[in-house]
Curated annotation (Swiss-Prot):
Organism (species): Methanosarcina mazei (strain ATCC BAA-159 / DSM 3647 / Goe1 / Go1 / JCM 11833 / OCM 88)
Subunit structure: May be part of a complex composed of 3 subunits; MtxA, MtxH and MtxX.
EC number(s) per entry: 2.1.1.-
Keyword Magnesium: no
NCBIfam families per UniProt: methan_mark_4
Name this polypeptide is given: Putative methyltransferase mtx subunit X
Length: 280
């Protein structure tokens, strides 16, 4: 897995995709991280937001002037005027609803890529607060996520989490339900040929032994993401939406660092181009 980041960086530099980034309430830190991605050769970065506000801070990057970056990001992606999009600091609800509308999708699945404080990378799902609330949702995330992870040259090892240890059965009905769900999901994923283990509540063991963590639901997944990236000294590279024809990497507005998310988007765009060559 440690070689994963090197592979992503190499693909980004080989591709140097045109990547659009949503901007609201711009600040120096945000714009500097976008400029750094272009300077390092990861992508040609296009900022999408209020030019007036962006120019107050200053940037050497291309700017598409709009007061509605949430909608324009999806328009740029669907029209293929850019190779990939990252949400940047655009609003989450508006951006994702515009994306679903533009692509005719009822639901989306996101797969976050995180680094622990010691630099260990792992994938995480679900990460949206309204995602992964049913067994079928989580199984869909496992199958889609495993497929996308393999495209990066990594064999997925799935670690399923639940709300307690097996010895806790009987203490709480909700905990019992998550444990039963964890056992069922693990068994079904194994039947589908995906290397999967139920780690109960022991996330520390799951991260050591697995590279794709499945949280009990989207709320706990979002909390794991925020704890690792914003409190635990780790980092979040972004959360790509799992789809074949387009590249959209969701990001959090909190951190302010978008260099690696742009790198990831450019690399995924490169993988998409390679896959389409093979198909055709």
């Amino acid at each position: 897995m440690y070689a994963l980041l090197e592979a992503i960086e190499a693909r980004a530099r080989a591709n140097r995709a045109r990547v659009a980034m949503g901007i609201r309430d711009p600040n120096h830190k945000t714009l500097e991280s976008a400029w750094k991605a272009q300077e390092l050769g990861y992508a040609q970065v296009v900022l999408v937001g209020s030019k007036k506000e962006i120019d107050k801070i200053g940037t050497g990057l291309e700017v598409i002037d709009t007061e509605d970056p949430e909608k324009v990001l999806s328009d740029l992606l669907v029209s293929r005027k850019v190779d990939a999009v990252i949400r940047g600091t655009a609003k989450a609800s508006g951006t994702l609803s515009s994306l679903k509308k533009a692509l005719g999708m009822k639901r989306i699945c996101r797969l976050a890529l995180l680094l622990t404080a010691d630099g260990t990378p792992f994938f995480l799902a679900p990460v949206g607060i309204d995602e992964g609330n049913t067994i079928s949702d989580k199984l869909r995330m496992i199958t889609l996520g495993a497929e996308h992870i393999r495209r990066l040259g990594v064999e997925p090892a799935v670690g399923v989490l639940s709300g307690g240890r097996m010895g806790d059965i009987g203490r709480d009905r909700r905990v019992d339900r998550t444990l039963a769900d964890g056992e069922f999901i693990t068994g079904r994923a194994l039947e589908l040929g995906i290397n999967t283990k139920h780690y109960t509540i022991l996330i520390e063991d799951a991260v050591k032994e697995s590279n794709f963590i499945i949280a009990p639901d989207g709320i706990s997944g979002n909390l794991i993401f925020r704890t690792v990236a914003f409190l635990g000294g780790g980092d979040g590279l972004g959360a790509p939406v799992l789809m074949d024809d387009y590249v959209f990497v969701d990001t959090s507005r909190v951190g302010g660092h978008f260099t690696k998310a742009i790198m990831l988007a450019s690399a995924l765009s490169h993988l998409n181009k390679e896959r389409k060559k093979v198909i055709h």
